Amino acid sequence: NESHNRRYNVNVHYNQMDELVKLLQDSLPNVSILLTTPPGSYESFRQRRRRRTYAVNPRTATASETIRRYAKEHRLLVWDMYDVVGGKRRACVNWTEAKLMRPDHVHYLPEGYILQGNLLYQALINAYNDYVSH
């Protein structure tokens, strides 16, 4: 959600993640933490005669990079959904072409959220299978 703010600030986002992770680690020291990146979305603009137009939200890629960097610097796990679903070039296009986004171009239809959950599930199962086979 941070990337939907047009005043998105990398440092603020990084520090907010740090506060949350430290709070979780202090409260639940033996629990693993998995960070995820956002799936991609659009932002809307008003055109003449109150017509809306949509463009890929450029801050999503920045927020995803911030999450990946934070995870790397703090030795946390991260599942990069943004990359899995197409990254900067295709994430939004893929969701739109599959007709899995709501008309606001930010939120997803139930089928879109189900797909996101299934992708995460498959990633976890694949990682576990790799772990037990090595």
Region annotations inferred by a language model:
Residues N1-V12:
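Oxyanion-hole/transition-state-stabilizing segment in secreted/luminal serine hydrolases
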Residues N11-D18, K22, N118, Q122-I125:
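Amphipathic, non-transmembrane alpha-helical secondary structure
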Residues H13, L24, T36, G87, ...:
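Functionally constrained cores in energy, signaling, and assembly domains
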Residues M17-V21, Q25, S32-T37, S41, ...:
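Conserved, well-ordered alpha-helix/loop/beta-strand core segments that scaffold catalytic motifs
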Residues Q25-S27, D130:
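Surface-exposed acidic, glycine-flexible loop patches that form ligand/cofactor-binding
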Residues L28-I33, E73-L77:
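Loop/turn elements at helix/coil->beta-strand transitions in domains of secreted/extracellular proteins
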Residues S41-H134:
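Catalytic His-Asp segment of secreted/periplasmic serine-dependent ester chemistry enzymes
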